[in-house]
């Protein structure tokens, strides 16, 4: 089995694509989804994001309904930064449980070291560009503006929390998190590098930290 966790709208054939977004369920009732968008409860971005019926709606933190050691490969991109560090540890522990001995987990996430280096370089890029500190805060993505009336903000908040970053990693801290989950981390890799299957379909963001870990045999 190959698991794609937090798949979003990136649905890859041959993988079990899993996402906990309410949009997975709303995509199964298109008329309701369009109605919520018309009254402004959902944004255009929510409306445009579509999920096929074979996407599994599940929360990894609650545990996935698969036996131990049944996954050869697990992939998740830009997921763990949306979790607190204790939650991320539980998330990777669930990945370790699901992996077969010798199975491989690949994680991509924003690279905190790259973000800090860009801030310290202090390059503004023109008089109309954001100040380095403002760009740094924007890149951290720890805040999401929620426009709209009270009901719209209430509903959007339940969608938007998934987009806020809670904890970022550099290569050393991500490797430590992997070890704490019982995995053996490898060195940082490049975009679509590392001998992992279907990266041409799974990996769509070129920037970030790319690392793999194996479950010990």
Regions found by a protein language model. Give the residues of each.
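Short amphipathic alpha-helical surface micro-motifs
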Residues: 1, 36-40, 150, 192-195
């Amino acid at each position: 089995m190959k698991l794609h966790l937090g798949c979003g709208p990136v649905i890859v054939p041959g993988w079990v694509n899993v996402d906990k977004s309410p949009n997975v369920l709303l995509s199964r009732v298109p008329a309701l989804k369009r109605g919520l968008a018309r009254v402004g409860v959902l944004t255009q971005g929510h409306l445009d994001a579509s999920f096929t019926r074979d996407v599994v709606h599940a929360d990894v933190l609650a545990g996935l309904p698969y036996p131990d050691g049944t996954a050869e490969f697990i992939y998740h991109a830009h997921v763990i930064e949306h979790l607190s560090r204790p939650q991320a540890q539980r998330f990777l522990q669930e990945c370790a449980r699901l992996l077969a001995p010798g199975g491989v987990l690949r994680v991509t996430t924003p690279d905190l070291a790259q973000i800090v280096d860009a801030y310290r370089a202090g390059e503004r890029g023109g008089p109309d560009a954001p100040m380095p500190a403002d760009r740094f805060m924007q890149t951290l993505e720890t805040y999401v503006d929620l426009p709209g009336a009270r009901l719209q903000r209430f509903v959007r908040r339940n969608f938007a929390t998934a987009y806020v970053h809670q904890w970022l990693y550099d290569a050393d801290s991500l490797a430590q998190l992997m070890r704490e989950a019982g995995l053996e981390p490898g060195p940082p890799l490049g975009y679509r590098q590392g001998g992992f299957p279907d990266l041409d379909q799974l990996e769509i963001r070129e920037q970030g930290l790319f690392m793999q870990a194996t479950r010990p045999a």
